[in-house]
Structure formats: C-alpha cells, structure tokens
Amino acid sequence: MKIPPQRQLAIQYNVNRVTIIKSIELLEAEGFIYTKVGSGTYVNDYLNEAHITNKWSEMMLWSSQQRSQYTVQLINKIETDDSYIHISKGELGISLMPHIQLKKAMSNTASHIEDLSFGYNNGYGYIKLRDIIVERMSKQGINVGRENVMITSGALHAIQLLSIGFLGQDAIIISNTPSYIHSTNVFEQLNFRHIDVPYNQINEINTIIDRFINFKNKAIYIEPRFNNPTGRSLTNEQKKNIITYSERHNIPIIEDDIFRDIFFSDPTPAIKTYDKLGKVIHISSFSKTIAPAIRIGWIVASEKIIEQLADVRMQIDYGSSILSQMVVYEMLKNKSYDKHLVKLRYVLKDKRDFMLNILNNLFKDIAHWEVPSGGYFVWLVFKIDIDIKYLFYELLSKEKILINPGYIYGSKEKSIRLSFAFESNENIKHALYKIYTYVKKV
C-alpha cells in the first residue's frame, strides 16, 4: 500500500512537514515502510493481514505431515460437541469410565508424590508400570522382560514412533482394510507405500505380499482382534499363517491390539503369542478400557527396537506423563482395573445386543452386518445403492447425528461404523431410527 505524499500528510494531520519527514524516517528505520526512488513510500507487505495469512498457508504446505481428509477434520471438530448424538464415537461413554477406581488410584499416587523428582522422564517409561505389564503379558502367553516394553502416549503414538524410528523412508506397508489407520496419515508422512488387504481376504495376504518380495523395506500392519471399524477378528489359524510367512521372509509385523481386553466370549491369543523369532511388534493401550485422556499405551518388541525407539522418543518429547503412568500402575496393582473390566465387558455386551436387536428389526432388508465378539463397533453395510456422503451431511445438518462413513477407513462399500460404547441406549435407539428414516427416504 502506498502512503500519501509528505505535503498531503502534513495538511491532513495539521502538523509541520518536518514532523512528517522525521516520522517517515523513523518508520522506515523500523522496517514498517520503504521508499522506492521515483515512485513513493509504501507499507511493507508483512503488515498486511491477507499477506500474512497467505504466507502462513504457504509455509504450512511445506509440512511433511499431511492434513486429514476433510470428513475426518469435520468429525474431529464436532466430536467434542455434546449437542450432537455420536453414534460412531470410538470411546467409552462417561458412565462406563472407572471414576471411583481412578479417584482411588490418583489418591494413592498423591500419597507418595514427594518421592518423585518431577524431572524429565527417560524414553522407556515408568519402571513399575513396565514390570506389571510384563506380568500381565506373561499370563497371556507372551514371555518378555522389562527391556522389551516401552510406555507410549497411546497406540497411535506408538505407530508414529515406529514410523519414524523403525521403518525406513519409502517403506511398503501391507495393512488390513477397512482400518482406522486410513483415517490418519500416519503411514503417509514418510512416503510409505500403502498396500491394502481386505479383511475378508486376509487368507490371500501371502499372495499379495509375494508381488513385492524383492522390496527389502516392508512391514505388515494388522489389527487381529476386534478390528476398528468392522469388529472382525482373525482366526488362530490365520494368525499362525501370518507369523509363519513373516518368519520365512523376514518381514516385521506391527500388531495393533488395542481392544485386547474387551471380549465377550473366550479370549483368543495375540499374534505375539506365536512369535518365536521376535518378528512381532505388539502395540496396545489403556485408552479404550479406562479413558482416552489417560494417554497411556505400550509397545512390546525386541530389546534393540525398544532401545532405538526410546532414543528417538527422547529427541521428541522426553516420554509420557509420569503421573498418568503411576495412576495406571496403581489401578493394575490393586486389581481395580481387572474388576472394572469384568463390569465393562458385561455392560458393553448388553449394549451391543441392544443395538443388534434394533438393527434386526429395522435394517435386515436393506443392510447386513456381523456380530462382533468384542470391541465397540458394528459395521453396517448397505445392500442398496445409497450416497453415504449425502447421508452423512443430512444427518449432521438436520438431525445433529454424527456418523462415521466407511470411506474414511478405506472401505469401498456403502458402509458406516456404529458404536455401542459411547451413547446411552436411548440415544442409540433414536439415532438408528433416524438413520433408517433417511436411508429409506434417500
């Protein structure tokens, strides 16, 4: 922007021209304005709001971390708004969280808080929590030591650490689909090549990987139990086949097992249980069983991998909150976590059955689904041709009902993820009736 001539400014502000000259010299010395000989005096662009905004936008394009797809951004923005019904939300409702147990664990932690140094933690995590996780893993047939366990700020954080600290650039990631990992960009930030294996075709994973057998830098990412979003699980035979193939071709497996403790029938073993050569990197979290805000998960891997990740961790954030780790440890030590799990499984199974009963009454002619034996989700796939994006926006704008459409998880089916974990039964019923009404209308 060009500023008026000195004479005009002196008249406009009723001051001496010398005052204007000195003011211009001062502003120019500070960099606010600049003079072009023969042209005039101009305000520097960086003071222009539009210019600043454009510059920030330009700089953000340089980021190695891609932004989420628009639908995911919108869901993330609305998920904290209590005025909506969140029929797809992937967390426990407030009534299912262990408030009393958490309060007691926090009180126990506070009683010996003076023993804490409150300095920076190491990258491995709280020793007592790592030790008790080792004990629990042993009871599930996974025999590891403290040196094989690292505490993280949740499962997704664990995957991010593996992406930058274990997998090389331009790696090939073979993963099951649909998967919540598709709603993130965690494997895209380092130019990883993503190869999808449909969950219902997992028996063909060997054939698919064989096409890339000459690529040295590759890994398998898989959710073996109660996949998010479909709720499906691998059979024990499928798990054995995957680990056998992994060992034969020296391909690491990233096992994302966040719903490991939420089962409604006899639990099945993790892939890590069959791991004899240390090929499986096992990931889990307390976010789905206690609360997302607790932000505590863990990685089980070979000592060498854990050492590498801990070093990377110290370059990023110096470790997870020691207080959160101590609270989780207290819940595990006094067995209140296990008591909470017994009740949680019972309530979630009951809520699952409530949702399935409504689906059977309303949707059996227009959709199909499977009965999950654990986790949070029912995967609803429509038999009829329907515009899922249109359904998403109609329910959002007219009914304040938020659904997670299947396409954000990499699904090509006309599908939505339903959750029985977050909303009350009353809201579940209301939302399903509204979805049915709009589907029939469309």
From Swiss-Prot:
GO molecular function list: DNA binding; DNA-binding transcription factor activity; pyridoxal phosphate binding; transaminase activity
CDD domains xref list: AAT_like (cd00609), WHTH_GntR (cd07377)
Keyword hit for Nucleus: no
Keywords per UniProt: Activator, Aminotransferase, DNA-binding, Pyridoxal phosphate, Repressor, Transcription, Transcription regulation, Transferase
Domain HTH gntR-type residue range list: 2-46
Top-rank taxon, per record: Bacteria
Cofactor list: pyridoxal 5'-phosphate
DNA-binding positions: 6-25
Modification sites for N6-(pyridoxal phosphate)lysine: K288
Protein's UniProt name: HTH-type transcriptional regulator NorG
Family recorded in the similarity comment: In the C-terminal section; belongs to the class-I pyridoxal-phosphate-dependent aminotransferase family.
Purpose: Positively regulates the expression of the NorB efflux pump and negatively regulates the expression of the AbcA efflux pump. Binds specifically to the promoters of norA, norB and norC and abcA genes. Could also have an aminotransferase activity.
InterPro entries: Aminotransferase_I/II_large, Class-I_PLP-dep_aminotransf, PyrdxlP-dep_Trfase, PyrdxlP-dep_Trfase_major, PyrdxlP-dep_Trfase_small, Tscrpt_reg_HTH_GntR, WH-like_DNA-bd_sf, WH_DNA-bd_sf
PANTHER family xrefs: AMINOTRANSFERASE, KYNURENINE_ALPHA-AMINOADIPATE AMINOTRANSFERASE, MITOCHONDRIAL
GO BP annotations, alphabetical order: alpha-amino acid metabolic process; biosynthetic process
Keyword Ribosomal protein: no
Organism the protein comes from: Staphylococcus aureus (strain N315)
